[in-house]
């Protein structure tokens, strides 16, 4: 949420007239978006996961992270903007549109669902896959991120 402020000083003269000063320059402040919530993560086939999360108001998009067992860290795997999903290429350090993954918005339940392909190459049958998400807004060309959601686990 963006807040803009203007300040104008005033005072009362001896003859009880109100005297106003000049208006200040516009000052603005941005609040971080709310922490998103992953409502469910389900397996979908052998290498896909269906992720559903609650939508937030005034949010530009969401970034999805997956836990990598090889590095023991969460890795950015993609982002959702509107009804589009973008995969993240860590070598090129940029997002590319993934036309295979469909984003479904449910206005009644206030949720977004997306099916993504997992990036873990060492796929094992009973391995757990962990996901977390954060939302962001854009302000003056910069992205302002929320806190990360609690991680959700799906067992393959």
Regions from the PLM with identified roles:
Residues 1, 63-124:
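Recognizes extended acidic, P/S/T-rich segments that occur
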Residues 1-16, 120-141:
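Beta-strand-rich modules
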Residues 5-9, 36, 51-53, 64, ...:
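An aromatic-rich alpha-helical recognition segment common to small helix-rich domains
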Residues 9-11, 29, 49, 61, ...:
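Small side chains
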Residues 16-58, 142-156:
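Pro/Thr/Ser/Gly-rich low-complexity, intrinsically disordered linker/stalk tracts
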Residues 111-113, 135-136, 150-151, 156:
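Short, surface-exposed beta-strand/loop patches at domain edges
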């Amino acid at each position: 949420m963006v807040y803009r402020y203007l300040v104008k000083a005033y005072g009362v003269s001896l003859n009880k007239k109100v005297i106003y000063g000049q208006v200040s320059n516009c000052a603005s402040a941005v609040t971080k978006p709310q922490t998103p919530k992953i409502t469910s993560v389900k397996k979908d086939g052998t290498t896909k996961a269906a992720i559903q999360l609650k939508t937030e108001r005034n949010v530009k998009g969401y970034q999805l992270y997956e836990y990598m067992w090889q590095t023991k860290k969460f890795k950015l795997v993609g982002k959702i903007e509107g009804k589009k999903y973008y995969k993240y290429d860590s070598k090129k350090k940029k997002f590319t549109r993934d036309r295979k993954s469909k984003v479904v918005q449910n206005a009644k339940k206030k949720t977004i669902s997306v099916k993504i392909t997992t990036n873990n190459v060492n796929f094992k049958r009973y391995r757990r896959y962990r996901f977390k998400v954060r939302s962001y807004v854009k302000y003056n060309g910069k992205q302002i991120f929320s806190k990360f959601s609690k991680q959700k686990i799906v067992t393959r």
